[in-house]
Amino acid sequence: MAKTQMQLANRAWRTETKSLGWHHGWKTGRKGWKAFCRENATITVEEHLKTDPPFEDQADANWHVAEELTYWTP
């Protein structure tokens, strides 16, 4: 079964933020980190579909999220 755009983006946010070590230190623990990823995935999908075609696969979603995170990290 094909993944939805939201599922691809959510997994990409979890994968990419975990690789940066952002999954540690949340006051609300793992649930807080997952909620953060889910909220940002929603925004990513909305903004991405305004200007670009849908994500082709997980690697494409990961690339777009990693690219977005380069603007967040010093």
Each model region followed by its residue ranges:
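C-terminal alpha-helical interaction appendages
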Residues: M1-P74
